[in-house]
Amino acid sequence: MVLEVKNLSFKYSQKLILDKLSFSVPKNSITSILAPNGSGKTTLLKCLLGLLKPLEETEIKACNKDILPLKPYEKAKLIAYIPQVEYYAFNFSVLDFVLMGKATHLNLFAMPKAKHIKEATSVLERLDLESLKDQGINDLSGGQRQMVLLARSLLQRTPLLLLDEPTSALDLKNQALFFDAIKDEMKKRELSVLVNIHDPNLVARHSTHVVMLKDKKLFLQASTPIAMTSHNLSALYDTPLEAIWHDNKLVVYAL
C-alpha cells in the first residue's frame, strides 16, 4: 500500500470531525473519497498533509514511512497536493510556478537547469497550457489554475498525489484532459492518487477504488464496481438513488 491510515481522528474546538478512520490506498490506483457535504473530506486531506494535527492515536504511513513527524520538505518528496482553487501571494509566471515542482529534486538555492525547463515545458504542452507559460498564475481562470497545479504536481514526481475537488472549476473537455494526464503518468511510473470528489459519475469513470465517509466514520471501502451500487449510494446519501452500469460507465440519478 502506498498510503495506510489507522485510527485517524480530528477535533476542531472540541467538536469531533473525523472518528477513527482506517483505510488504505493501493499502488497504482485512483482512490476516490465520496461523502455527503460537510463530512470532513477536505479536513481529512489536510490531516494527511500535516496542515492539521490529528489526535494522538492516529497513524499515517506513506510508502512505509511514518509521515506525521516528517518535515514539510520531506513530505513533499512523497506527496504532491492540488488544493481547491486559490490565489497566491506572488503572481509567478506559469512556467516558474510549474518549475517549483522540481524544488525537492534540487539542492538548497540551486536554480532549475535547462533539462528541468524542458521537462516543465513538455508537461505544459501535454496539458495544452504552453500558450500560458508567461502569464501570471493569478491572472488565469480557476480552471486554468487547476490545470497548472496538475502540471506542477506531475513535475514533482511523487509516489502519491492528493487532489481536493480538482475538477470543480473545469469544463467537460478539461475534466477528461485532467484525468487522462494522470492515467498516462500512471502508465510511465508508479503513481497512486487519493481524490476528494463529489460527482459519483466521475468517481465511477476514473476511480479504481472508493472510500465512503458518513457520520464522521468510514462507511465503506471497496473497488469501484463493488462500492458504486444503488444500495450503497442510497445509504450513503440518505436518499433513494439508482445506479446503472452500462459499458463500464455509471449513471446515477435520484428516484
Curated annotation (Swiss-Prot):
Any one biological process term the GO annotation gives: iron ion transport
Boundaries of each ABC transporter domain copy?
A: 3-240
Species the sequence originates in: Helicobacter pylori (strain ATCC 700392 / 26695)
Q: Which Pfam families match?
A: ABC_tran
Q: Could you tell me which Gene3D superfamilies the record lists for this protein?
A: P-loop containing nucleotide triphosphate hydrolases
State the name under which the record lists this protein: Probable iron chelatin transport ATP-binding protein HP_0888
- Which residues does ATP bind? 35-42
For this UniProt entry, the molecular function terms from Gene Ontology, in alphabetical order, are: ATP binding; ATP hydrolysis activity; ATPase-coupled transmembrane transporter activity
Q: Does the keyword Membrane apply?
A: yes
Its membrane topology, per UniProt? Answer: Peripheral membrane protein
GO CC term (a single one) = ATP-binding cassette (ABC) transporter complex
Chain's role: Part of a binding-protein-dependent transport system for an iron chelatin. Probably responsible for energy coupling to the transport system (Potential).
**Compartments it resides in:** Cell inner membrane
Q: Which CDD domains match?
A: ABC_Iron-Siderophores_B12_Hemin (cd03214)
Which InterPro entries does the annotation name?
AAA+_ATPase, ABC_transporter-like_ATP-bd, ABC_transporter-like_CS, Metal_Ion_Import_ABC, P-loop_NTPase
Annotated signal peptide: none
Family that this chain belongs to: Belongs to the ABC transporter superfamily.
- Report keywords, A-Z: ATP-binding, Cell inner membrane, Cell membrane, Ion transport, Iron, Iron transport, Membrane, Nucleotide-binding, Transport
Say yes or no: keyword Cell membrane present: yes
